[in-house]
């Protein structure tokens, strides 16, 4: 189970920062990883799979925005989350 407050504290720029792209990407990544585990055991859950694809698309858009605005922050975040190889 994801602990939102810990993720916000770790990736946020200030106390209670929930709107920055870094926090949003980290929260989406945690939810995506959790849903991936669910879909491994429930292969026919297509409703959840659609939600997963929507989350992945939203994370992709946020990553593109962050890459454009703050390249160093983008590189640090993907290294910390282990997203790109």
Curated annotation (Swiss-Prot):
GO biological process: translation
GO cellular component annotations of the record: cytosolic small ribosomal subunit
A GO term, aspect molecular function: rRNA binding
Superkingdom of source: Bacteria
InterPro entries in UniProt: Ribosomal_uS15, Ribosomal_uS15_bac-type, uS15_NS1_RNA-bd_sf
Subunit structure: Part of the 30S ribosomal subunit. Forms a bridge to the 50S subunit in the 70S ribosome, contacting the 23S rRNA.
Sequence similarity: Belongs to the universal ribosomal protein uS15 family.
The protein's role, per its UniProt record: One of the primary rRNA binding proteins, it binds directly to 16S rRNA where it helps nucleate assembly of the platform of the 30S subunit by binding and bridging several RNA helices of the 16S rRNA.
Protein name: Small ribosomal subunit protein uS15
Gene name of this polypeptide: rpsO
